[in-house]
């Protein structure tokens, strides 16, 4: 891993194709042929970096001020962004405009599409949207929040999950899905809706929350707008 291009990703560093350790970009221009027949499950959390966690002023931001920040970020596409956001997340709070992840989600979608068009093995996509109640809800569904649920360590990691009944119930469902995927390549599990495979056309994903559901291309218009901007946070 090398630091050569300060514009790479949000952290200013990224792996570099050096012809030795990393001989090629794994998903450019297509998914790797060597893993064509291996099923993949991939996903993100809804909020990932959760701007309001480390920017307290955003936690109770008014809709007017949130929209003002959106206009600063998206300029003449702000109205398109706001309309697409409301379509994808109709019950959103003002801070959601600033907390929702647009760094990992677009790249994960692209990786899923490249894998799916190979038609060699299924792709299963997820979005983890459950919000932790700890620290007065400050963490929301932040980066790595799904991990205690995947391994069913919800109670052991109560400092992150709260360890309540709803969290435990979700942990049972998610850990079963991950175990099934590890065993069979198919994550369908008791207590969850039918988990359809992701395709470039259907944009199918399992939306994990207290009420789990399948969504199809729910944020397509929103992500299409995001793709026209550099990958940077507010």
List where the protein language model places each region.
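A structural signal for short secondary-structure junctions
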Residues: 142, 172, 198-200
